[in-house]
Amino acid sequence: MVSQRRDADAPKDSPKSILESLAGTRVLVVEARYYDDIADELLAGARAAIEAVGAEARVFTVPGALEIPAAIAILMDAGRKAGGPYDAAVALGCVIRGETGHYDIVAGESARALMDLSVAEHLPLGNGILTVETMEQALARARVSDMNKGGGAAEAALSLLAIKRAANLEPAR
């Protein structure tokens, strides 16, 4: 029989304990503001999740979801070269299906590029690019008071960072 470890028994370097000590962590947030109301909600949720652990968010804006992966790659590289690297990244945006195949390209290629970047660079990255059928679906997923996908994306990035630190791949600041 496999037993589940209680939180009190968790080692000090477990992802949970590291997640609780992320003060000073620098999180890069790149948002596409194609739909301002949705972008506002996604960003509010992400900021709240980042600030809840004492981390710092640095926000950059791009025109659309396809530009997000390139912007993250550019900004991560710039941060390393400037001596102030980011510890994690969050992608925020929204793609709503229209009448053409453009949706499939934007949704698929942005997700693929983010995954490729995350895996190749060992980058803790939360994907908060919504891919939905309608504006109503987008608003429900974006609203902090509803599904809070912006907050969820930030929490995913922070959780991956905690795992990376627990594996001793990146020192805590």
From Swiss-Prot:
Which residues span the membrane?
A: none
According to UniProt, this protein's pathway is: Cofactor biosynthesis; riboflavin biosynthesis; riboflavin from 2-hydroxy-3-oxobutyl phosphate and 5-amino-6-(D-ribitylamino)uracil: step 1/2
Catalyzed reactions per annotation: (2S)-2-hydroxy-3-oxobutyl phosphate + 5-amino-6-(D-ribitylamino)uracil = 6,7-dimethyl-8-(1-D-ribityl)lumazine + phosphate + 2 H2O + H(+)
Task: Kindly give the InterPro entries that the UniProt entry links to this protein.
Answer: LS, LS/RS, LS/RS_sf
Question: In the record, what terms sit under GO molecular function?
Answer: 6,7-dimethyl-8-ribityllumazine synthase activity
Give the GO terms filed under biological process for this record. riboflavin biosynthetic process
Q: According to its UniProt entry, what is the function of this protein?
A: Catalyzes the formation of 6,7-dimethyl-8-ribityllumazine by condensation of 5-amino-6-(D-ribitylamino)uracil with 3,4-dihydroxy-2-butanone 4-phosphate. This is the penultimate step in the biosynthesis of riboflavin.
Q: What is this protein called?
A: 6,7-dimethyl-8-ribityllumazine synthase
